[in-house]
């Protein structure tokens, strides 16, 4: 998504290409805000700074010494990390360092009557609202990263439902902002996911949908919008989404600006594309064929 290509290699280093996307949008004149629900000094590391990964004791002298190293390792093209540091404070207050291994009593990650996800979503919406009201302020690219589906009890997903629904309802009323909801997988660490067949199907059921306001659709033009509608029924990748984002950043005020080969989802994806055509697909990825959700008898001739 961030780099527009797979960064997997033999080194297995944790890379996400975040600097590729943010540097481009800074050149396009955007302000960039990215925040997450992970804590930067946890052993699992941080999405915002994948090259920095070191666990230290909170509030220790060692923490003070390594904070400067963390800031140097963090993406220089970010204008703001939003509430990422608040994530650390909330997790520490609950006696944990990450949302992956929480006790059931803290599984909703609730702090002062609100969940951690609610804080991040509210901040993103508030930031966008202030940006939209002031025509003199640079447009914004905002990325909010939530690890909801990694919690073991399943409570956090249920708690986040209402907050995410409210956020999307508010974004649907925006006149100038394209909103993209994207997941990499369904809940995968709950007993439901691990022990039931329907739960195992959810693990491999990521979602993606895009909210395009009427005003933005007019600027994009008929060809781009037609391609978006068509591609809802095509095999698409996050690389296509990356191309779409870059195309938005490059757009002039003219909706008739050329649609290039790298325009991603703004160009019709081939109806004959298969998983074999996708470069850099991870070996543990599951590609579904048409009719995957139909149950077959073991004696069926369709079973090999």
Predicted feature locations:
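Beta-strand elements within well-structured catalytic alpha/beta cores of enzymes
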Residues: 1, 25, 139-146, 157-160, ...
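Active-site-proximal alpha/beta segments of enzymes that process anionic O-linked groups
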Residues: 1-155, 205, 262-263
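Exoplasmic/lumenal regions adjacent to the first transmembrane segment
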Residues: 14, 23, 30, 270-304
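Short, flexible loop/turn elements at secondary-structure junctions
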Residues: 29, 36-39, 146-150, 183-187, ...
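Histidine-centered active-site microenvironments of extracellular/periplasmic hydrolases
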Residues: 49-53, 159, 172-177, 181-224, ...
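Fold-level signal for large, globular catalytic cores of enzyme and receptor domains
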Residues: 108, 167, 171-175
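Short, hydrophobic alpha-helical segments
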Residues: 128, 132, 180, 245-253
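Non-catalytic, well-ordered alpha-helical segments in soluble enzyme domains
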Residues: 216, 222-257
């Amino acid at each position: 998504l961030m780099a527009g290509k797979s960064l997997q290699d033999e080194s297995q280093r944790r890379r996400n290409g975040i600097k590729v996307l943010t540097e481009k949008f800074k050149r396009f004149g955007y302000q960039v805000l990215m925040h997450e629900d992970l804590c930067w000094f946890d052993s699992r590391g941080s999405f915002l700074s994948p090259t920095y990964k070191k666990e230290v004791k909170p509030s220790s002298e060692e923490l003070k010494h390594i904070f400067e190293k963390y800031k140097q390792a963090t993406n220089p093209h970010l204008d703001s990390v939003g509430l990422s540091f608040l994530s650390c404070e909330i997790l520490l207050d609950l006696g944990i360092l990450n949302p992956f291994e929480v006790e059931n009593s803290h599984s909703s990650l609730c702090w002062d009557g609100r969940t951690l996800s609610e804080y991040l979503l509210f901040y993103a919406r508030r930031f966008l609202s202030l940006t939209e009201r002031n025509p003199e302020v640079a447009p914004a690219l905002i990325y909010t990263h939530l690890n909801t589906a990694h919690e073991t009890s399943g409570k956090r997903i249920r708690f986040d439902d209402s907050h995410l629904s409210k956020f999307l309802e508010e974004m649907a009323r925006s006149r100038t902002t394209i909103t993209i909801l994207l997941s990499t997988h369904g809940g995968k660490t709950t007993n439901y996911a691990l022990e039931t067949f329907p739960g195992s199907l959810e693990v491999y059921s990521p979602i993606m949908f895009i909210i395009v306001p009427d005003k933005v659709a007019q600027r994009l033009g008929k060809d781009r919008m037609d391609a978006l509608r068509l591609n809802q029924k095509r095999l698409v990748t996050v690389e296509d989404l990356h191309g779409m984002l870059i195309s938005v950043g490059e757009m002039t005020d003219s909706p008739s600006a050329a649609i290039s080969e790298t325009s991603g989802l703004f160009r019709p994806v081939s109806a004959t594309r298969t998983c074999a055509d996708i470069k850099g697909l991870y070996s543990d990825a599951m590609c579904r064929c048409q009719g995957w959700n139909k149950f077959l008898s073991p004696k069926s001739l369709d079973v090999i």
